[in-house]
Amino acid sequence: MLQKIQRFGGAMFAPAMLFSISGLMVGVSALATTADIVGDLAVYGTPWYVFWTIIQRGSWTVFKRLPLLFAVALPIGLAQKQPARCCLEALVAYFAYCFFLSEIIKLSGDNLGLEYPSSLTSASGITVIDGIKTLDTGIIGPLAVSATVVAIHDRFYDAKVPDWLGTFSGSSLVYLISFFAVFALAAISAAIVPYVYDVTDTLRHALAGVGPFGVGIFVFLERALEPFGLHHLLYMPIYYDNLVINDGIYATWSSLLPILSHSTRPLNELAPWAGFTATGWVKLFGLPAIAAAFYSTAKPERRAGLRVILVP
């Protein structure tokens, strides 16, 4: 079981590997279009401004398409057979899931406490996935769809069918079964997600008000789970989903960077949610504590030699 959970966490990390270059380019382009940093080069309409604005728009690709990335990436690490075909099946199944939810909200949104928007803009609880107005399930929805498709794929991809049904073997059979499976998943999602929103809002306000103590607990849990390969399950919803702030901490930070750079107010007032990204400090200030732990638990006769190693 632990090995399966580790594989799941590793599969989730695949899209995260793309965040570094995307975040770097978002940051660089934001700085390049900030007049306080580059001066008159960043004036609207100049070739410099036009170039970096286009670069910045393209740099948002990963952050603006997170659900699709997670839907496609999960089979890479989890599928036992033909993972490339499983990625295609998962992508199509996720689109079907979004269309199912879109129609459910359109027909029964009033009963669910959701309002179907008249235009292609996000509303409360509603998001737009490649032109599909659907329920906002964050990255949990695509992960659930993708995991379902992976299970169906590994079970039925090599299933034997009569010769006259040969067209429906392989990926066709997997998608046929997945089609009805994600329909059931969409119905369940439509029923429970509005209640999940209430819990998420409560948790979001709680996390926003925990201060340094809460961030310390988060860092401790992340480091405790890291040896088991399970830390992705902890930080993914906080960094990349809507648990702490809409659109996730990293995407919001990148979009607000020009505003933050102009402000003279303390960062903990402007963006208190950004404290959850300060996990790197534990590596710096945790070293003296680690050294003290080594020294205090060493045998008395060996402490002098250990001190020579630890202090430098």
Predicted region positions:
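Cytoplasmic-side transmembrane-helix entry/capping segments in multi-pass membrane proteins
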Residues: 84-92, 166-170, 306-310
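Helix-loop-helix hairpins and the membrane-proximal interhelical loops
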Residues: 3, 7-11, 15-57, 193-301
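Hydrophobic faces of alpha-helical transmembrane segments in multi-pass integral membrane proteins
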Residues: 17, 21-24, 63, 67-71, ...
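Membrane-interface helix-loop-helix junctions at boundaries between adjacent transmembrane segments
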Residues: 113-119, 124-136, 147-211
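Transmembrane alpha-helical segments in integral membrane proteins
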Residues: 66-78, 142-158, 236, 272-303
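Long, well-ordered mid-to-C-terminal structural blocks that present hydrophobic/aromatic surfaces
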Residues: 297, 309-312
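Early transmembrane hairpin of solute transport permeases
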Residues: 2-162
